[in-house]
Amino acid sequence: MVDLLTGESPHLAGYSIVRADDGLSVKRRAGFEYLHKAPYLKNKLCEPFVVTAPYLEEEQDKPIHLSRHQGNELDYIISGRLRFAYESHVEELGPGDVALYDSSRGHGMIAIGGEPCVFLAVTIPGPEII
């Protein structure tokens, strides 16, 4: 992924340090801000992002858009509140809460509570969806 975004291949071996305000900005979902926190580490088994979900009043009473991608995902809430949908299940998460799930199934989220939600999202590749 980093090769496509920057033209530079991951080149760090063993470990990577990325400071609090640093990382590679990635466009994934409209309105959400994704900051890749280990873009240049070679041979990593997961992709860590700090994600900011904006609070949008117009989303609050609508069904949450569900997406799918291969593997698993772990979302750790840092600040704010998140309404998390996994297929037909809906949960509300706050600071310190964690969701770990099979991301090949429908999942989505929106910020709630009148403010953005910041969370650590770690995607872990898995088998391709057939």
Language-model segment annotations:
Residues M1-Y15:
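Short C-terminal boundary/hinge segments that cap the last helix of small helical domains
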Residues H11, N43, E128:
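Flexible, glycine-rich phosphate/dinucleotide-binding loops
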Residues G23-H65, N72, V122:
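A short glycine-rich, His/Asp/Glu-containing loop-to-beta-strand
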Residues Q60-P95:
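A short beta-strand-loop-beta hairpin characteristic of the jelly-roll/cupin
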Residues S103-G114:
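Catalytic core of Fe(II)/2-oxoglutarate
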Residues I112, C117-I130:
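Double-stranded beta-helix
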